[in-house]
């Protein structure tokens, strides 16, 4: 009998240890102090989630009174295709309490997220559109299916978009802003990427609808939590419009590895939205960056006009496809144009071709695989364990 009691106590102790959530990826120079993302276990009900938030609020207020903390507590809640999470500013004692809740899967620091663009090169030629519609290099004609993404909506998760730019006339609306109160593109990056994925002149999917989702400031930075909040809004908006299977997200941004960021884009993809992301610009393995390292989404590395890997482009086995990213001419706020380089410029090429495929009846789940199947095996020195496939739209040219 005594032995049974000992075993019972031992098993209870194991269960208690297993119940504790883990803290994912502590530390780093990009951590936002005292700001955290808390991810719940799968299957947590709305009632359990609300109860947890209430308990956390009470614990936070108690610890705040004890220690004189200025942390603001819970901020935003997320529900992306059943993936429940929230963010907030908490002291260490409150985080310890959260980690001990058996409904919590993991906690991670909120981190700075930045653009994946590099340099401006004035008066550079437009070459990317011609390249993605021809097997051989050097042709400037853009050949594409006449549907051109019609009926598909692309969400530009970025610095905002100049919705008055002629490139987007009659096809664009403002969506949401998770970073500030300025519903403009004070940086220009988001307008440029939108011009590439769906601009009338510089775009791939010239008839697609566009939604501006601002998650990065005019300075080009934001937070993981702000990006997740933007993705959450996108999924909710797509559902409300009965547009699953007819929508795409472009994320020309990134930061250090974040499981929460990866989970968010994965759930968006699984919900029925094609997601294209930038590989990053550090000439390193993209598996160490997010959302580039999420296996479920389509990760784009950058190529040059000579079909070389761009010197800055991240690489690695997580990369799905190369696309034009060096010296890309596209739209700029105020009705003009500018030339930028980066994997930020590669991703919207992929997003635009993906949107065009959706318009032709290819399913969300099939798009990235289809791009890899028909891509041109032409990239020289693509990087260790990296595909040499260059984006191609299947025009037959």
Swiss-Prot record:
Active site: 158 (charge relay system), 189 (charge relay system), 344 (charge relay system)
Every Peptidase S8 domain range: 126-397
Cellular component aspect of the GO annotation: extracellular region
Location(s) in or outside the cell: Secreted
Glycosylation sites: 250, 393
Enzyme Commission number, as recorded: 3.4.21.-
Gene Ontology terms for molecular function: serine-type endopeptidase activity
Propeptide segment residues: 20-116
Coiled coil (residue ranges): none
Chain ranges of the Inhibitor I9 domain: 35-116
UniProt-listed GO biological process terms: proteolysis
Keywords per UniProt: Glycoprotein, Hydrolase, Protease, Secreted, Serine protease, Signal, Virulence, Zymogen
Species assigned in the record: Trichophyton tonsurans (Scalp ringworm fungus)
Main location: secreted
Function of the protein: Secreted subtilisin-like serine protease with keratinolytic activity that contributes to pathogenicity.
The family this protein is said to belong to: Belongs to the peptidase S8 family.
PANTHER family for this protein: CEREVISIN-RELATED, PEPTIDASE S8
Gene name linked to the record: SUB3
The protein's name in its UniProt record: Subtilisin-like protease 3
């Amino acid at each position: 009998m005594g032995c049974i009691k000992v075993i019972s106590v031992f098993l209870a102790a194991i269960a208690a240890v297993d119940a504790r959530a883990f803290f994912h990826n502590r530390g780093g120079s990009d951590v936002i102090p005292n700001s955290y993302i808390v991810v719940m276990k799968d299957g947590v009900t709305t009632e359990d989630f609300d109860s947890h938030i209430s308990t956390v609020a009470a614990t936070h207020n108690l610890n705040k009174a004890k220690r004189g903390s200025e942390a603001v507590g819970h901020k935003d809640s997320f529900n992306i295709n059943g993936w429940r999470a929230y963010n907030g500013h908490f002291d260490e004692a409150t985080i310890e309490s959260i980690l001990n809740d058996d409904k919590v899967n993991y906690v991670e620091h909120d981190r700075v997220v930045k653009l994946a663009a590099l340099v401006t090169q004035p008066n550079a030629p437009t070459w990317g559109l011609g390249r993605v519609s021809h097997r051989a290099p050097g042709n400037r004609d853009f050949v594409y299916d006449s549907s051109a993404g019609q009926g598909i909506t692309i969400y530009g998760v970025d610095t905002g978009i100049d919705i008055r730019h002629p490139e987007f006339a009659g096809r664009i609306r403002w969506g949401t802003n998770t970073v500030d109160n300025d519903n403009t593109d004070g940086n220009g990056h988001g307008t440029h990427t939108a011009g590439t994925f769906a601009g009338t002149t510089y775009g791939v999917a010239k008839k697609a609808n566009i939604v501006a989702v601002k998650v990065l400031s005019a300075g080009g930075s934001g937070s993981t939590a702000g990006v997740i909040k933007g993705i959450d809004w996108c999924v909710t908006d797509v559902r409300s419009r009965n547009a699953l299977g007819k929508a795409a997200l472009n994320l020309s941004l990134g930061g250090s590895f974040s499981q929460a960021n990866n989970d968010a884009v994965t759930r968006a993809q699984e919900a029925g939205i094609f997601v294209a992301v930038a590989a990053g610009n550090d000439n390193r393995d993209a598996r160490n960056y997010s959302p580039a390292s999420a296996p479920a989404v389509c990760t784009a590395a950058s190529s040059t006009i000579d079909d070389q890997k761009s010197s800055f482009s991240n690489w690695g086995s997580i990369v799905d496809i190369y696309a034009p990213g060096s010296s890309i001419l596209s739209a700029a706020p105020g009705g003009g144009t500018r030339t930028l380089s980066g994997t930020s410029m590669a991703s919207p090429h992929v997003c635009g071709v993906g949107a065009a495929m959706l318009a032709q009846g290819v399913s969300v789940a099939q798009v990235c695989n289809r791009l890899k199947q028909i891509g041109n095996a032409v990239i020289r020195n693509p990087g260790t364990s990296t595909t040499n496939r260059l984006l191609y739209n299947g025009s037959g040219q």
